[in-house]
């Protein structure tokens, strides 16, 4: 089973035994492959999630009907060996790092996004995340999208007129132009698949 906190700062996904007892503050997916993990933990899915989800303070509220059910996964992602391998490498390294440091997901990702954090293993985790993003983008055949990240600040408009802006924590992320490009492609793909489903009358709509 793949799980993610319903509200969290980082939308960090984990693979847990099916016998685990979950609270209602955890979203559960009946998936367990590393390819599924790679797709969900990737920045393309994060871009989609941040566009469609609501926020609670600095946290992200993950709603499956908005963030998961509408997400256009790459074609044949379940059998994509490159996606499986990238997800496996990232997941295993992250798990080993958490055991070594004794830190959970939130504190590990706080280090991941900290511009002053230069521990070699955190740097390696960032590299593996970029490799996982590359595998996901390649699965979409979007080979011309770059995976380079920067430490950037996000801002949240406050007030009805947007006159006040609240600074949010640093994030190691894609530049805005890359995020916007990937989101536009995902929205287009989502619309194409919804139209195909409507024309054939088979299955559920993607949107």
Task: Indicate residue ranges for each PLM-predicted region.
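S-adenosyl-L-methionine
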Residues: 1-207
